[in-house]
Amino acid sequence: MTQLSVVILAAGKGTRMYSDLPKVLHPIAGKPMVKHVIDTAKQLSAKQIHLIYGHGGDLLQQRLSAEPVNWVLQAEQLGTGHAMQQAAPFFADDENILMLYGDAPLITATTLEKLIAAKPENGIALLTVVLDNPTGYGRIIRENGSVVAIVEQKDANPEQLKIQEINTGVMVASGASFKKWLSQLDNNNAQGEYYITDVIAMANRDGYKVEAVQATNLMEVEGANNRLQLAALERYYQKIQAEKLLLAGVTIIDPARFDLRGTVTHGKDVVIDVNVILEGSIQLGNNVKIGAGSVLKNVVLGDNVEIKPYSVLEDSVIGESADVGPFARLRPGTELAAKAHVGNFVEIKKSTIGEGSKVGHLTYIGDSEIGANVNIGAGTITCNYDGANKFKTIIGDNVFVGSDTQLVAPVTVASGATIGAGSTITKDVAADELVITRVPQRHIQGWQRPTKK
């Protein structure tokens, strides 16, 4: 089987984005456009991925430092052919070279596999699409059904401008063929650029067969040159993700108001309300309910978990039949055991909450271990930070913590203890003790409220 290498063109500035960020780093579903293309290339088992970079190269390399790509500098942006010329020294004669674009993130491996399979042994295959309005695109010129050339919009004559089949820019040929044709490119055109599309005419001249494969989905080959186009790609991507989940049995109340910015696995009878955002790696058990406006990132939810509206969870694990929210925030390192309850306006960070325990409202729990069947009263704060270091609070099983309590870490409250409301706990509490630290109540008779003078 012939090996495959992929070239991704990613040197453009993206002037119409009006941004300091290189165009290909603008995100679709929370991931840079070019990263989508790299991931697709990986699905094709490419031997090597050559990434052509230019504008914003330092930032591009920084953001993609973990990617297994060969960085190829295009110091001057003199056209697509010029970009390919920079990568040509790395091409092996006997491998196939697939050319992709870093700002066209929705191309699928399935479509590219069809294109690669259609490539003649001695020839080139290119991906085309038919548009109702082809303005701005290179036109496919055919003679007797065969592709003989591609003419760019600015170089096309009036008759050629009527053609609706356009070039997507995606093509595949052997390394030897590309090297031969790239060495013969010139910039004798209206733009003064080196067009990769000129290799089609060269292939015909040399007697090579040119095979065209029509993409069936326009959005798959669409690029994003401005933020309006970027938003259109985002909406299409999210539509596809929602449809996949719906067909797999997930209820999404309004697919147009759902965003998936990562991957999700799920059980049966999951219900997702409107304006929910799922990021990173999400695992949902059976009968999970996620309320409106909630944001989940890298979260595991067990069976029968309910996330009530407008809750934010990150890097957290929620046990079966637990519930969270509304308006709760679970920060990284939070683990809730089965049947735990976290109510409104509660923030938890790097803490475990035991089975059946309740943190009802208006509470901060940080760097803590809380046992089973504990009740944390409203307004409780674990004071875990002294301005320099973090300290731990440990609460045993069956503890009752009254409202408006401050637990000054490091501190341990043993099982069965009761903390009276309004207490500030600075020392360890033994099992089954009652601790009250508030000032005794005083009654002042005959007191007069002050009046305005």
UniProtKB/Swiss-Prot annotation:
Gene3D superfamilies listed in its UniProt record: Hexapeptide repeat proteins (2.160.10.10), Spore Coat Polysaccharide Biosynthesis Protein SpsA, Chain A (3.90.550.10)
Catalytic activity from the UniProt record: alpha-D-glucosamine 1-phosphate + acetyl-CoA = N-acetyl-alpha-D-glucosamine 1-phosphate + CoA + H(+); N-acetyl-alpha-D-glucosamine 1-phosphate + UTP + H(+) = UDP-N-acetyl-alpha-D-glucosamine + diphosphate
Major place of residence: cytoplasm
Spell out the CDD domains in the cross-references. Answer: GT2_GlmU_N_bac (cd02540), LbH_GlmU_C (cd03353)
Note down the stretches annotated as region Pyrophosphorylase. 1-227
Instruction: Tell me the segments the record calls region N-acetyltransferase.
Output: 249-453
Q: Where does acetyl-CoA bind?
A: A378, N384, Y385, S403, A421, R438
Superkingdom to which the source organism belongs: Bacteria
Family annotation (InterPro entries): Bifunctional_GlmU, GlmU-like, GlmU_C_LbH, Hexapep, Hexapep_transf_CS, MobA-like_NTP_Trfase, Nucleotide-diphossugar_trans, Trimer_LpxA-like_sf
| Pfam families on file | Hexapep, NTP_transf_3
List, separated by semicolons, the cofactors it needs. Answer: Mg(2+)
Keywords, alphabetical: Acyltransferase, Cell shape, Cell wall biogenesis/degradation, Cytoplasm, Magnesium, Metal-binding, Multifunctional enzyme, Nucleotidyltransferase, Peptidoglycan synthesis, Repeat, Transferase
- Keyword Endoplasmic reticulum included in the entry's annotation: no
One annotated Gene Ontology cellular component of this protein: cytoplasm
In short, the EC number is 2.7.7.23, 2.3.1.157
* Chain positions recorded as UDP-N-acetyl-alpha-D-glucosamine binding sites: 9-12, 23, 74, 79-80, 101-103, 138, 152, 167, 225, 331, 349, 364, 375
Q: Which sites bind Mg(2+)?
A: D103, N225
Q: What does this protein do?
A: Catalyzes the last two sequential reactions in the de novo biosynthetic pathway for UDP-N-acetylglucosamine (UDP-GlcNAc). The C-terminal domain catalyzes the transfer of acetyl group from acetyl coenzyme A to glucosamine-1-phosphate (GlcN-1-P) to produce N-acetylglucosamine-1-phosphate (GlcNAc-1-P), which is converted into UDP-GlcNAc by the transfer of uridine 5-monophosphate (from uridine 5-triphosphate), a reaction catalyzed by the N-terminal domain.
Q: What is this protein called?
A: Bifunctional protein GlmU
Which species is the source of this protein? Glaesserella parasuis serovar 5 (strain SH0165)
